[in-house]
Amino acid sequence: MGKKATDHHILSVILGNGGHFPAGEPQSGVGSWDVFTKVGGDIGISHSWQAGLSYWSAPDVQDRTGASHAHDGATETAAFSGSSHIAGLDFVYKWAPRGNPEQRNFKLQFEYFQRDEDGDIVMQGSDPLESSSYTGKQRGWYAQGVYQFMPQWATGVRYDRVSTDNQGSDDAILEEASLNNAEYRPERYSAMLQWKNSEYSRLRFQYNLDRSTGEDDNQFFVQYTFVLGSHGAHTY
């Protein structure tokens, strides 16, 4: 007979005062809120999965400061006031023969986020005071797969990408605030081979094709990781 599914469901709601990025100044009441849920379970005895949704919102951000620069001897700092919202999606799939990952296993992982903002940018310290309307949309996602083909060996690939679409009434002010980057589409391809000596040490060889600057950047890494002392159990 097949193994009984072990489904799980998690729901969480968090209220905050809006005093941490990407919100702005703390408020006396509820300045931000966050809700997320995760569901998952087993498919037979060799497969399992988990999916999650999250949403964060700060409807009244006040004076969130960001990029600054010197102009004619004075320092100008970009401050955003308006609304900010972030939505996220994540998914994990795991495979192991008859539920035993010691010899072979595979893990597929995906995550996506999107931030939407609407409000105004003010260059604090400018004289006369400079401002611009601002509507921004930033997206990012990655997908990766790791296959352990022997007890001590694993290989994997990964793809990352982010994009922006920022609009406003004054492009010069958005550029000063480091927000005038509608054509910015950085991406990266990665591949790795890993040898695990034990639970506490591993050696990884990794190659990245990084296009975050618009140019091809070939990167090679050799990484050795080890753990000293006891450590907690791994999460899903």
Predicted regions and their residues:
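Residue-level signature of outer-membrane beta-barrel architecture
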Residues: 1-4, 39-41, 93-95, 147-149, ...
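Short loop/turn motifs that connect adjacent beta-strands in outer-membrane beta-barrel proteins
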Residues: 4-9, 42-51, 96-106, 152, ...
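Residues that define the transmembrane beta-barrel architecture of outer-membrane proteins
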Residues: 29-33, 83-87, 137-141, 185-189, ...
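Detector for outer-membrane/organellar transmembrane beta-barrel domains
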Residues: 46-179
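Outer-membrane beta-barrel "beta-signal"
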Residues: 89-91, 195, 217-236
